[in-house]
From Swiss-Prot:
Residues 1015-1040 are annotated as: Disordered. One of its GO terms (molecular function) is calcium ion binding. Residues 50-157, 158-269, 270-385, 389-497 form the Cadherin domain. Pfam families: CADH_Y-type_LIR (PF01049), Cadherin (PF00028). The keyword Metal-binding applies. Residues 24-49 form a propeptide. This is Desmoglein-4. Three calcium ions are usually bound at the interface of each cadherin domain and rigidify the connections, imparting a strong curvature to the full-length ectodomain. Disulfide bonds: none annotated. It comes from Rattus norvegicus (Rat). The keyword Transmembrane applies.
Length: 1040
């Protein structure tokens, strides 16, 4: 470790060199600024060239001249030249002036006057060394002269008198007040350390308070404070510096503590019992006064008493209140007493305070009862009204003399001594707001003195009130009673009834009647008046609800008119003066209860008959008409009917006859058959029920054309069902449906001109429920499914490793089971080359190579590419016997669109799993076509045998972001594929040679009812899987 020691020595030498080069150290110290009361950081510089002598300390309030010179400054430069020393700062050229002086030659600094630390605790002197030209030879020096503190300031309290409050019975050590004193001497020094002490307490006695020596907090010594004994304490507190030493300075202050009252004393009554007397039938506002004694502070809620009657006041004759000035309880008589009933009454009075009792004594309180005897004096009593008020009812409809002669009733007074009606009394009406009443002075009979208005303001809620007085002739005593009169409302309109039916049958006589009243509402009461003999016996009336009833009879009537008098009463049991007569006409009726002749029904009231004619109008002798008529709703319905009658010919003119179009593709809904492949069947395999069938692969020659079609389209869609190919003289599994929204173009073997209709170029059957499974389709199906599973395994790196099985202790009975875990063993893989097609996919997975399929035994028919521009258009109908029809037409050449700016190109290859002998067609981009083209290549060959190329025109060279994808489309030979849909949109015409040209072509994938084919990209579906994406920066154009 010698190198470590050597390193430390080198670092120490380097540090010393740096220290020698630097000329000074700066040290910061904390200094208090007395003038503005702030603390600042000052710097003390230690010079390498020592040219000062530290100043001596100075004591305040003393003559420090005997210590002169208190400091001396000297520079090394004085050896070579003459130096003048100068000083400046506080005490020199700033207040206080003239405290320090300096010898400019020797540099001695002297103090010349007495200093005060409380004014200037520190003097900062700036020293300079000047040459003869007045230039600084040294850096200016700061000289600090500290003034030493002397205990020359006594403590000073912030207040001369402190005032505090505290409740009596407070807990011990409760804070009362905090005293505060300051000392001008140096902080954090013994001269400024103050100690507090209680010197005296008034009133004298046991000390009740103590003070904290250092904080000045005054607290209680115990919980014995009692306001009833002493309500005020005066304390004399002294504060001494030097921590209370005898040589310290001190000052004193007064502390006045007021004891607050709490409700800790229970009130008691001055006497143990009370008594009083009063005459019967008299009231008293001050029957007796009860004095309560309470030691708490007067005028407060702790002192005010709250009186209560505990018992004896069964008739609520007495009340007791508190006089807040004297704290007395005033007993009042609020109801008259009866000597005959209660000659003596004994009360129990209790008292407590209005404020709650203090928690220290609340549990000890018990209310004590004080007895009070009330003696009732018997006197000769005057008359009185029993009951004190009486209600009378007035019959409605009374006017004039009948009202004046009507007697409401008699209201007389009784003699309380005897209990019989009073004799020597006279009656007069007292308060009568409307002056409507009069009374017989001897009998007390009450009558009306004038007519009155039932709508008068003196009538409240149908009730009129007045007073009656009974005056004793002997004693002059007066009794007062109240008269209440129920005034009925004027019934200006009688309840009017009317019948529902105008005629009744003789064998089933019943009619419904209704009541209408303007003044009073339901319920109404109905009764038949027996004016003529046996009227009430024949007719019976029953109420249905509050406003209607049914009039009926159980007897068989004779044909002819009938008059039934009916009396109707309202809810106040009032009715019209005369009963109302209902006129009915009994007639012979047929089986449908219809009268054989018309009749007239009316209502007879006295001399007036209200008749209802056939038109429903009620007349009063032909003069008055009722309010029955045609309303706005009826008029509106009539007008609406007339309008509909006039508009019906116009509506018939708008109707047109249309022929029913023949049913075609998509005109009816084809339900999924019961054996559809979209449903799992009992045989637990995908597809139709397995059948042993010999299905040969059909490969027929196809016709193609190199003619390029150009079309400008805005809304074009194409659906393609591809199976085996297009044949000459026959059709096998190809269907092309092209729909053009707005397009014009040329097609060989198809429709020409402006294509706006949906046409079927080549069609065949799409349902193959009775055919077998296409082995080529299964081959492609499982191959693509295996590729999809391989793609998923590539996305799972955690499973991409060799798995070693754990040894479980015993060997396997099958010895070769362990070899399957090592794929690196040498295996003879040559036998996999001769496997059947159904095992070819498994072999390709194991060998990681693509096995060439066996050559087809069927000869490949060459595709003819020399097709004329004008050719036949073949249509194949779906039937067992194929019928071919031929049509020729001349197409019109459409103008080519202008090339667009080069952009991205998406090229999509869609392969159809079918016979491997068909070669893929070629996509050719014409030079007139713009970029941004999506191209779909449809190949009638298995996926693994496709060997084509993509040709791109020259004008889209150097184009980036070319998207290339492969999709597998199921063959129509697969069962239940006829119900599937192929593609949503395909823009551009389909040529017979398989060439697709268009400004923007997009083909979507084939949709199939098969659940595996309908899976999305990157899933386990073998029919729709995306394999590779290649980006081309340069695409060469070639034509084949």
């Amino acid at each position: 470790m010698d190198w470590l020691l050597f390193r430390n020595i080198c670092l120490l030498i380097l540090f010393m060199v740096v220290l020698g080069v630097n000329s000074e150290f700066i040290v910061e110290v904390k200094e208090l600024d007395i003038e503005n009361g702030t603390t600042t950081w000052q710097t003390v510089r230690r010079q390498k060239r020592e040219w000062i002598k530290f100043a001596a300390a100075c004591r305040e309030g003393e003559d420090n001249s005997k210590r002169n010179p208190i400091a001396r400054i000297r520079s090394d430069c004085e050896v070579s030249q003459r130096i003048t020393y100068r000083i400046s700062g506080a005490g020199i050229d700033r207040p206080p002036y003239g405290v320090f002086t300096i010898n400019p030659r020797t540099g001695e600094i002297n103090i010349t006057s007495v200093v005060d630390r409380e004014i200037t605790p520190l003097f900062l002197i700036h020293c300079r060394a000047l040459n003869s030209r007045g230039e600084d030879l040294e850096r200016p020096l700061e000289l600090r002269v500290k003034v030493m503190d002397v205990n020359d300031n006594p403590p000073v309290f912030t207040q001369n008198v402190y005032t505090a409050n505290i409740e009596e019975n407070s807990d011990a050590n409760a804070l009362v007040v905090k005293l505060s004193a300051t000392d001008a001497d140096e902080d954090n020094h013994l001269n400024s350390k103050i100690a507090y002490k209680i010197i005296s307490q008034e009133p004298a006695g046991a000390p009740m308070f103590m003070v904290n020596r250092y904080t000045g907090e005054v607290r209680t010594m115990s919980n014995f404070l009692d306001r009833e004994q002493h309500s005020m304490y005066n304390l004399l507190v002294r504060g001494s510096d030097r921590d209370g030493a005898t040589d310290g300075l001190s000052s004193e202050c007064d502390c006045r503590i007021k004891i607050l009252d709490v409700n800790d004393n229970f009130p008691i009554l001055e006497k143990t019992s009370y008594s009083a007397s009063i005459e019967e039938n008299c009231l008293s506002s001050e029957l007796i006064r009860l004095q309560a004694i309470d030691l708490d502070e007067e005028g407060t809620d702790n002192w005010l008493a709250q009186y209560s009657i505990l018992s004896g006041n069964d008739g609520n004759w007495f009340e007791i209140q508190t006089d807040p000035k004297t704290n007395e309880g005033i007993l009042k008589l609020v109801k008259m007493l009866d000597y005959e009933q209660e000659p003596n009454i004994y009360l129990s009075i209790g008292v407590r305070n209005q404020a709650e009792f203090h928690h220290s004594v609340a549990s000890q309180f018990q209310m004590h009862s004080t007895p009070v005897r009330i003696q009732v004096i018997n006197v000769r009593e005057g008359p009185t009204f029993r009951p004190s008020s009486m209600t009378f009812s007035l019959r409605g409809g009374m006017r004039g003399d009948s009202l004046m002669n009507y007697v409401l009733g008699t209201y007389t007074a009784i003699d309380m001594d005897t209990g019989s009606p009073a004799t020597n009394v006279r009656y007069v009406i007292g308060h009568d707001a409307g002056s409507w009443l009069k009374v017989d002075s001897r009998t007390g009979e009450i009558q009306f003195s004038r007519e009155f208005d039932t709508k008068s303001k003196y009538i409240t809620d149908g009730m009129y009130a007045a007073e009656i007085l009974a005056i004793d002739d002997g004693s002059g005593r007066t009794a007062t009673g109240t008269i209440c009169i129920e005034v009925p409302d004027a019934n200006d309109y009688c309840p009017v009834i009317y019948a529902e039916s105008r005629s009744v049958c003789t064998h089933a006589s019943s009619v419904r009647i209704y009541v209408n009243d303007h003044s009073f509402g339901a319920p109404f009461t109905f009764c038949v008046v027996d004016e003529s003999p046996d009227t009430a016996d024949i007719w019976d009336i029953r109420s249905i609800n509050g406003t209607s009833a049914i009039l009926m009879t159980e007897q068989t009537l004779s044909p002819g008119p009938y008059q039934i008098p009916i009396l109707v009463k309202d809810s106040h049991n009032r009715a019209c003066e005369l009963p109302q007569t209902v006129l009915l006409d009994a007639c012979l009726c047929d089986d449908y209860h219809v009268c054989l002749h018309s009749s007239t029904t009316g209502i007879y009231t006295g001399d007036t008959i209200w008749v209802t004619d056939d038109m429903g109008t009620v007349t009063d002798d032909g003069l008055r008409q009722s309010n029955v008529g045609l309303g706005p709703a009826g008029i509106g319905m009539i007008i609406l009917g007339l309008l509909l009658l006039f508009l019906s010919p116009l509506l018939l003119l708008m109707c047109c006859c249309k022929r029913r179009q023949p049913e075609g593709l998509g005109t009816r809904f084809a339900p999924v058959p019961e054996g559809g492949e979209g449903v799992m069947q009992p045989w637990r395999i995908e597809g139709a029920h397995p059948e042993d069938r010999d299905v040969s692969n059909i490969c027929v020659p196809m016709t193609a054309s190199n003619t390029q079609d150009r079309i400008d389209s805005s809304e074009i869609y194409t659906n393609t069902y591809a199976g085996g190919g297009t044949v000459e003289g026959g059709v096998s599994g190809v269907e092309l449906n092209t729909g053009v929204g707005t397009a014009a173009g040329i097609a060989a073997g198809g429709a020409t001109g402006t294509l706006r209709k949906r046409s079927s170029t080549i069609g065949t059957l799409r349902e193959y429920q009775d055919t077998g499974m296409n082995m080529a389709f299964l081959d492609s199906y499982f191959s693509e499914k295996a590729y999809a599973y391989a793609d998923e395994d590539e996305g799972r790196p955690a499973n991409d490793c060799l798995l070693i099985y754990d040894h479980e202790g015993t060997g396997s009975p099958v010895g070769s089971i362990g070899c399957c875990s090592w794929i690196v063993d040498d295996l003879d893989e040559s036998y996999m080359e001769t496997l059947d097609p159904k095992f070819r996919t498994l072999a390709e997975i194991c060998l990681d190579t693509e096995i060439e399929p066996f050559p087809s035994h069927q000869a490949c028919i060459p595709i003819s590419t020399d097709l004329p521009l004008l050719g036949p258009n073949y249509f194949v109908n779906e039937s067992s016997g194929m019928t071919l029809s031929e049509a020729e037409f001349q197409a019109e050449m459409a103008a080519a669109s202008e090339p667009m700016i080069h952009g991205d190109i998406i090229v999509t290859e869609t392969y159809t799993a079918t016979d491997p002998c068909v070669q893929p067609t070629t996509i050719v981009f014409d030079s007139q076509l713009p970029p941004n083209v999506v191209v779909t290549e449809t190949v009638m060959a298995p996926v693994y045998d496709v060997q084509g190329n993509i040709c791109v025109p020259a004008e889209i060279a150097n184009t980036h972001n070319v998207y290339y994808a492969e999709r597998v489309v199921a063959s129509p030979g697969v069962p239940d594929m006829g119900n599937g849909n192929i593609g949503d949109t395909c823009i551009g015409p389909v040529m017979s040679g398989g060439i697709l040209v268009g400004p923007e072509i997009q083909v979507t994938q084939m949709m199939s009812p098969d659940i595996h084919i309908s899976q999305t990209t990157r899933s386990t579906s073998p029919m729709t899987s995306q394999h590779r994406v290649t980006r081309y920066s340069n695409i060469h154009y070639s034509r084949q």
